[in-house]
Amino acid sequence: MALKGYVANIEKLTEKNTDFRHVLYTGKHSQLVLMTLKAGEEIGMEVHDHVDQFFRFESGEGEVYIDGAKHKVKDGDCAIVPAGAQHNVVNTGKKELKLYTIYSPPEHVDKTVRHTKKDAEKMPEEYDGKPTE
């Protein structure tokens, strides 16, 4: 069976996204996820012991914390958090902070959608080993 992969205009999808977390595609070794943080909202301080994480910011303003170091971010910026680093993303602006993130390896169950941070906290999920294809 031929694998299809995933091809899309990620900027448009990220800008249209209103969900706190929306898993688009899960491969064997990486996962593409859209995120939107409301004004003043944050992902929450966390550590992924075995997962590297890439962030790309499409709109809004915020701060990324990586092992205690604070970095301001805006449209066009990116950040990479190495596995084992304590990190957080905070929306410091008055508008939504829109971003996509790539986990390597995957972190969430494929096709997971959590409309709000509260939903994500109530229904945490860990990757079950099943990729999109």
PLM-predicted stretches and their roles:
Residues M1-H29, H115-E133:
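A short, N-terminal "cap"/entry segment at the start of jelly-roll beta-barrel domains
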Residues I10-M45, V51, I102:
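A short glycine-rich, His/Asp/Glu-containing loop-to-beta-strand
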Residues V51-G62:
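Glycine- and acidic-residue-biased ligand/ion/polar-headgroup-sensing regions
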Residues A69-A83:
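Short acidic-glycine-tyrosine-enriched beta hairpin
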Residues A83-V109:
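Ligand-binding loop in jelly-roll beta-barrel domains
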